[in-house]
Amino acid sequence: LNTMTIAPSSPSTAALKRELKAAEARKRTMALLLVAPLAIFLLLIFVVPIGTLLTRAVQNPEIATALPNTVAALSGWDRKTPPADAAYVALAADMTKVADSEAMGALARRLNTEIPGYRSLVAKTARAMPLKGDNDAALTPAQTRAKFIDVDARWGDVAYWQAIAKNGSQVSPFYLLAALDHKQDGFGHIVQADPDQSIYLAIFGRTFVIGVAVTLFALLLGYPLAYWISTLSERRANLVMILVLIPFWTSVLVRVAAWIVLLQSEGLINTALIGSGLISHPLTLLFNRVGVYISMTHILLPFMILPLYSVMKSIPPTYQRAAVSLGSHPFAAFWRVYVPQTYPGVGAGALLVFILAIGYYITPALLGGPNDQMVSYYVAYFTNVTINWGMACALGGLLLAATLVLYAVYGRFTRTNVSLG
């Protein structure tokens, strides 16, 4: 059929258009079906966990769930003077209802994070429920207040009621503020946390210092090695690259254990240094920052070498030779002609190593000391030891946010298209 002889309005033209549209629809459907497994995998393994993490960082259901009537009674309270008798009546009703349930334990744990000792107050009060007068007579609101204060005088302290009032919502910035060494005072204003609780900004600072140091060490070692590999013949380059990739085939625990053997006081490194006469006493290389730097640099070095090598391999060697033939010094030609062309590899490698470094847990935990633990250690601590998912998610979410901000700033100022994939 010669389509050039078909009129635009003929039935054959309309049928041809329908067939073309159907073919395009089939192609789009096939493309979506091919991409669907990867999209579902990313959704379930990446998007949903991160979304859950960010959600748990601001969830605050314990008080609103266990004490709904009390929260409602305190909604109009000025938080300066003791609450009205109606608040005591509401608290008595709520605590009687949840006295023997799991909600009471969650309530006690949550309030104890606000005021140390609140857990014992909640437990003591729960044992006294329900409140009754003489001969099991019903109590008036004023008598209910008096009963609470008889159970424990702390119920007359405004601070304990403020802790309930400011956490009446299902969503709260409590954990995020705590991770930034801040808190809400009794009136809901954001203030600096107490000195004995202001530790997390220092931990974040330590994490980024270690990440930057490991990135610089990996760059200093990886750049010349990647350059040397790029100048080798293909056969020799493949052989050296196999040696570079060996750490990928070895468990992290095995590599860390090997460094423990090497760095200990009677290890190979100290033995060799003492035998050569360079030192007279063993160096302290374990359970401090030195051991962390050495092991993390070794483990992350391939992540720096691979992006650098891929970029260097694509740079024609004729550029440097041309610069030298025009009178440039060989080092000047290398520095001014060759190095700028490797910036994409430097950026990709540095970003990859840094992001991996700030999330490391097992290496600092085994080779570092108490002052060398990073944010990941405290995420694991709150997850596995104290079972404080809110704090763990807040620390993890802030670390993720800081990483994304640094990535965006890097891309903005360098104007390079560095991909994390």
Give the role of each language-model region.
Residues 197-228, 339:
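Transmembrane alpha-helix signature in integral membrane proteins
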Residues 1-33, 52, 56-201:
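Membrane-topology segments of multi-pass transport proteins
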Residues 11, 309-320, 324, 393-421:
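C-terminal transmembrane helix and the adjacent membrane-cytosol boundary/short C-terminal tail
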Residues 17-19, 23, 52, 214-245, ...:
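Transmembrane-helix boundary motif in ABC transporter permease subunits
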Residues 40, 244, 298, 304-309, ...:
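Transmembrane alpha-helices
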Residues 20-21, 185, 255-297, 367-371:
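Membrane-interfacial helix termini and adjacent extracytoplasmic/periplasmic loops
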Residues 27, 66-69, 365, 370-411:
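Interhelical loop and adjacent transmembrane-helix boundary motif
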Residues 24, 28, 237-238, 289-291, ...:
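Amphipathic cytosolic juxtamembrane alpha-helices at the membrane-cytosol interface
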